[in-house]
Amino acid sequence: ACNTATCVTHRLADFLSRSGGMAKNNFVPTNVGSKAF
């Protein structure tokens, strides 16, 4: 399992990028991750 915010954020970003290509362009984990969550 993945419990840390960083890990969850990256997994979420990866999931979104696989589900819809546009999500990857609108979501930047390195810049928004910690603030978005």
Swiss-Prot record:
The modification Phenylalanine amide is found at residue 37. GO terms for molecular function: calcitonin receptor binding; hormone activity. Disulfide bonds join 2-7. Gene3D superfamilies: 6.10.250.2190. GO terms for cellular component: extracellular space. Keywords: Amidation, Disulfide bond, Hormone. GO terms for biological process: adenylate cyclase-activating G protein-coupled receptor signaling pathway; regulation of cytosolic calcium ion concentration. Transmembrane segments: none annotated. The keyword Disulfide bond applies. The keyword Disulfide bond applies. Belongs to the calcitonin family. CGRP induces vasodilation. It dilates a variety of vessels including the coronary, cerebral and systemic vasculature. Its abundance in the CNS also points toward a neurotransmitter or neuromodulator role. This is Calcitonin gene-related peptide.
